[in-house]
Amino acid sequence: MERFALWFIFLAGSLAQEDLVGNVFLFPKPSVTTYAILKPEVEKPLKNLTVCLRSYTTLTRFHSLLSLATSNPLQDNAFLLFSKPPNQCSIYINQEENVFKVDPTAVEWKHTCVSWDSVSGVVELWIDGKLYPRTVSKKASSIGFPSSIIQGQEQDSFGGGFNIDQSFVGEISDVHMWDYVLTPDHIQKVLFANMDFNGNIISWRSLQYELRGQATTQPKRQCKTLEHHYGLFAKCYK
């Protein structure tokens, strides 16, 4: 009984599921041991996908925002959202890289959404509500499972193979994943933090996760003003 109790305490300390609205994942330093593991609500092949998140960093080098690998050793980049400052972003779908030229951004919160439809192969990248020219990747395929979904590192193997030069340093918040392609109207709802519109695969409102190394959850202290785009302000947490 004592061993069972100790094991339960260990699990409770290493695995959490909670509403993280108003909070961030903080990755304070370059490292290969600091990262967050996200647990999907459902494990299944994904023929359609949308991922949205907010990020805040001063990094000027390449870094991963979200890495999804499968147990297939040939699919360490089944889905990868990879930033290449100052003006490129790469989206990997089943190992195929799709490079987008994007506007350079200042040091402020950035909202990013990526969607992929397997029937058409169309990949969309939205940054702060702006849709960049679309591309086509891996038509008629699917993203397999089981999956390892990690933030803070880029996986070169299932759950590992990290490179400190690709690690994320900064803050990430409002992470959501859907098993379908969001419409432009849905993208706008997510951009403006509509509390009634949350991911059905991963939801920041009910997130099961593990933090490793120096990664922590912290209250969100900054927000990005959207005044120059829309004459509005995004919601801030203090």
Swiss-Prot record:
Cofactor note: Binds 2 calcium ions per subunit.
Domain of life: Eukaryota
GO CC annotation: extracellular region
Binding residues annotated for Ca(2+) 1, in chain numbering: D76, N77, E154, Q155, D156
InterPro entries: ConA-like_dom_sf (IPR013320), Pentaxin_CS (IPR030476), Pentraxin-related (IPR001759), Pentraxin_domain (IPR051005)
Alphabetical keyword list: Acute phase, Calcium, Disulfide bond, Metal-binding, Pyrrolidone carboxylic acid, Secreted, Signal
GO molecular function (one): metal ion binding
Cofactor needs: Ca(2+)
Post-translational modification: Cys-89 or Cys-223 or Cys-236 could be involved in interchain disulfide linkage.
Signal sequence extent: 1-16
Subunit annotation: Homodimer; disulfide-linked. It is not known if it assembles into a pentraxin (or pentaxin) structure. Pentaxins have a discoid arrangement of 5 non-covalently bound subunits.
Name this protein carries in UniProt: C-reactive protein
Native organism: Xenopus laevis (African clawed frog)
Taxonomic classification: Eukaryota, Metazoa, Chordata, Craniata, Vertebrata
Gene designation: crp
